Amino acid sequence: GPDRDEVLGTVRRLYAELVGYPEDVFESGTDLEADLGIDSIKQTEAFARITDHFGIPESAAVDVRLTGYPTVDAVADLVVELAEGRELTGTVA
C-alpha cells in the first residue's frame, strides 16, 4: 500500500485546497469539525477526492462513517487500510 506519510501529506493538501485553509492548520490532533469548522458535507467531499486520488473504489469506502475519523491522521490511517484492501473494522460510528 501507499506510504502513510505520503498519504497524510496528500490528505492535508486536499483538505486545504477544498476549504481554503493553509495546510499547517491540519495538525495531527486537530478535529476537522470541532476545531476547524469543516462540516460532514465538506468532509465527505474531501474524502471522495482523497479516495479518487488513491484509486480506492467507491464500493470499498461506501460504508465508512466519517464521524469516526475526526482528524487528518485518522483519515490517513483509514486510507492506508482501504488502499491495502484490508477488511475494515470499526467503521460503524
Where are these regions (language model features)?
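4′-phosphopantetheine-dependent carrier domains
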Residues: 1-93
